[in-house]
C-alpha cells in the first residue's frame, strides 16, 4: 500500500510551523495510542503513521529532503522502530551528488575522514506524574562502542595503521575512461589513506565493538509527548576514533485515568448527584498535589467548568504554571429504593404546571421551540 502524505497524516499544511506539527501529532497520539484502547481497529497503525510523520517533519534536514523528493528520500534506510532505533533515516543526497560530480570533474573529496558515529533514538514512556514532576531513569541501550583494546584505532596494541600502498595516502586513485580521467575512492583503503596490516584481535580492525550500556537520563519537569532530549556523544562510537553520535530520547506520555493534558492545563470530569447540582454543596477533587475542596453553587448544570488556577503543569521552559479545569457531569441516580422512587415521583408532580416551568427553563424553551416548529409546518 502506498504511503500517505506526511502532511495529510497530521492534518497540517505544507508550510506549517513546528509548533503546529507538534500540536497535531499530540492530538493524534492521544487519540490512537495503544494505551487508550481505541475502538478503531487500525488505531495502532495510525499511531505509528503519525509518529513517523512527526519524526520526519520536525527534523529540518529530513523535512527538506521529504519536501523535495517525497517518500523516495527515505527508501534506503528506515526510521528505526520499537523502543530503540537508529537516529538516521533517509539517503544523504548531498553525498550522492557530491560523489558523482566530484569523481567526473576531479573535484571530489580527497582523503576521507573516518565517519562520525550514528545517532541513536530511544523511545521513553512516562506516566503523567513523571512528566509533570520530572524524573531520573536508567535506560539500557545496545550500541557500537569504542574498542577498549585498540582504543578505536583498529590496530593491534603495539602496532599502528600504515600508509596505503595503492594510493600512497591520498585516499583516491585516478582511472582513465575515454577522454576523461576519473578520481574515485581507493578500493584498497576505502578512501582513508591508511590500512591496518595487523588488526586488533577483539574488534578485527573495525575499532568498534557491539556493547550494551546503561545511562542515567534526567527528564526535566513539564515535558510532554513529542518532546525530545539530546544526550551529546552517547550515540554510536565513530569509526577509528572519530566523534561519537548523539542519543535522542523521545518522550511519550501514557494516558491517565483521571486527567487529560492540553498544553500546560489539565482537564478532568467531576460527577455530582442531581441533588447537589440543584442545592449546591462542597466536594473534594483530585489534583496532582493531593485533594482540594471545590464549592459547587446551587443550580449547577452539566458541562459547567470550574478553573483551579496554578493546579496544572509548569512549563518545561519556565514561566507560569497551568490550571486544572474541572467539568461537572450531573449523574442520573440508579438502583433506587422504593422510598427514593416515591420521593422522586412527588418531586416530579411538583414540577407540573406553570410553577414547574420556572424550575426547568431550558426544557420550557425547548418545548416552545418544538411547538413553533410544528406550527410552522402546518401553516
From Swiss-Prot:
Binding-site residues for Zn(2+) 1, renumbered to this chain? 147, 150, 200, 203
What does the Swiss-Prot or TrEMBL cofactor note state?
Binds 2 Zn(2+) ions per monomer.
Kindly list the ranges of residues that form CR-type zinc fingers according to the record: 134-212
Q: Name one GO biological process term.
A: protein refolding
Could you list this entry's UniProt keywords, alphabetically sorted: Chaperone, Cytoplasm, DNA replication, Metal-binding, Repeat, Stress response, Zinc, Zinc-finger
Is Zinc-finger given among the entry's keywords?
Answer: yes
Which GO MF term does the entry hold, naming one? ATP binding
Against SUPFAM superfamilies, the record matches this protein to: Chaperone J-domain (SSF46565), DnaJ/Hsp40 cysteine-rich domain (SSF57938), HSP40/DnaJ peptide-binding domain (SSF49493)
> What are the binding positions for Zn(2+) 2 in this chain?
164, 167, 186, 189
Location in or out of the cell: Cytoplasm
Q: Which InterPro entries match?
A: DnaJ (IPR012724), DnaJ_C (IPR002939), DnaJ_domain (IPR001623), DnaJ_domain_CS (IPR018253), HSP40/DnaJ_pept-bd (IPR008971), HSP_DnaJ_Cys-rich_dom (IPR001305), HSP_DnaJ_Cys-rich_dom_sf (IPR036410), J_dom_sf (IPR036869)
Q: Does Electron transport appear among the keywords? A: no
The residue ranges of the J domain are 5-70
Cofactor(s) required for function per UniProt: Zn(2+)
Gene3D superfamilies this protein is in?
DnaJ domain, Heat shock protein DnaJ, cysteine-rich domain, Urease metallochaperone UreE, N-terminal domain
Provide the Gene Ontology terms for cellular component: cytoplasm
CXXCXGXG motif repeats: from-to residues: 147-154, 164-171, 186-193, 200-207
| CDD domains assigned | DnaJ (cd06257), DnaJ_C (cd10747), DnaJ_zf (cd10719)
Q: What is known of its domains?
A: The J domain is necessary and sufficient to stimulate DnaK ATPase activity. Zinc center 1 plays an important role in the autonomous, DnaK-independent chaperone activity of DnaJ. Zinc center 2 is essential for interaction with DnaK and for DnaJ activity.
**In UniProt terms, what function does this protein have?**
Participates actively in the response to hyperosmotic and heat shock by preventing the aggregation of stress-denatured proteins and by disaggregating proteins, also in an autonomous, DnaK-independent fashion. Unfolded proteins bind initially to DnaJ; upon interaction with the DnaJ-bound protein, DnaK hydrolyzes its bound ATP, resulting in the formation of a stable complex. GrpE releases ADP from DnaK; ATP binding to DnaK triggers the release of the substrate protein, thus completing the reaction cycle.
How it assembles, according to the record, is:
Homodimer.
Query: Into which family does the record put it?
Result: Belongs to the DnaJ family.
User: What is the protein's name according to its record?
Assistant: Chaperone protein DnaJ
Q: Which organism is it from?
A: Yersinia pseudotuberculosis serotype O:1b (strain IP 31758)
What is this organism's lineage?
Bacteria, Pseudomonadati, Pseudomonadota, Gammaproteobacteria, Enterobacterales
Gene name, per UniProt, is dnaJ
Amino acid at each position: 500500500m502506498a504511503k500517505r502524505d506526511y502532511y495529510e497524516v497530521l492534518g497540517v499544511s505544507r508550510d506549517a510551523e513546528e509548533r503546529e506539527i507538534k500540536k497535531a501529532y499530540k492530538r493524534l497520539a492521544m487519540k490512537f495510542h495503544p494505551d487508550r484502547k481505541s475502538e478503531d481497529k487500525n488505531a495502532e497503525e495510525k499511531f505509528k503513521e503519525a509518529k513517523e510523520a512527526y519524526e520526519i517533519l520536525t527534523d529540518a534536514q529530513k523535512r527538506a529532503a521529504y519536501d523535495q523528493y517525497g517518500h523516495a528520500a527515505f527508501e534506503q534506510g528506515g526510521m528505526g522502530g520499537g523502543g530503540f532505533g537508529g537516529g538516521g533515516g533517509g539517503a544523504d543526497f548531498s553525498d550522492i551528488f557530491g560523489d558523482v560530480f566530484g569523481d567526473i570533474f576531479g573535484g571530489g573529496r580527497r582523503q576521507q575522514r573516518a565517519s562520525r558515529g550514528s545517532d541513536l533514538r530511544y523511545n521513553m514512556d512516562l506516566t503523567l506524574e513523571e512528566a509533570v514532576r520530572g524524573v531520573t531513569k536508567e535506560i539500557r541501550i545496545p550500541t557500537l562502542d569504542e574498542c577498549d583494546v585498540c582504543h578505536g584505532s583498529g590496530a593491534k596494541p603495539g602496532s599502528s595503521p600504515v600508509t596505503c600502498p595503492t594510493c600512497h595516502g591520498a585516499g583516491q586513485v585516478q582511472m582513465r575512461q575515454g577522454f576523461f580521467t576519473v578520481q574515485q575512492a581507493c578500493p584498497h583503503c576505502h578512501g582513508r589513506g591508511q590500512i591496518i596490516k595487523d588488526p586488533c584481535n577483539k574488534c578485527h580492525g573495525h575499532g568498534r565493538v557491539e556493547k550494551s550500556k546503561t545511562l542515567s537520563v534526567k527528564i526535566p519537569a513539564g515535558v510532554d509527548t513529542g518532546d525530545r532530549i539530546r544526550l551529546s556523544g552517547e550515540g554510536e562510537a565513530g569509526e577509528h576514533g572519530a566523534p561519537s553520535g548523539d542519543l535522542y530520547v523521545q518522550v511519550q506520555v501514557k494516558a491517565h485515568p483521571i486527567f487529560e493534558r492540553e498544553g500546560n492545563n489539565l482537564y478532568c470530569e467531576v460527577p455530582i448527584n442531581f441533588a447537589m447540582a440543584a442545592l449546591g454543596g462542597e466536594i473534594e477533587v483530585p489534583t496532582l498535589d493531593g485533594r482540594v475542596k471545590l464549592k459547587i453553587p446551587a443550580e449547577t448544570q452539566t458541562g459547567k467548568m470550574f478553573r483551579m488556577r496554578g493546579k496544572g503543569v509548569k512549563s518545561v521552559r519556565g514561566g507560569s504554571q497551568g490550571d486544572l479545569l474541572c467539568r461537572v457531569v450531573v449523574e442520573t441516580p440508579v438502583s433506587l429504593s422504593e422510598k427514593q422512587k416515591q420521593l422522586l415521583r412527588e418531586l416530579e408532580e411538583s414540577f407540573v404546571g406553570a410553577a414547574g416551568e420556572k424550575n426547568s427553563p431550558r426544557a420550557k424553551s425547548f418545548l416552545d421551540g418544538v411547538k413553533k416548529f410544528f406550527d410552522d409546518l402546518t401553516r
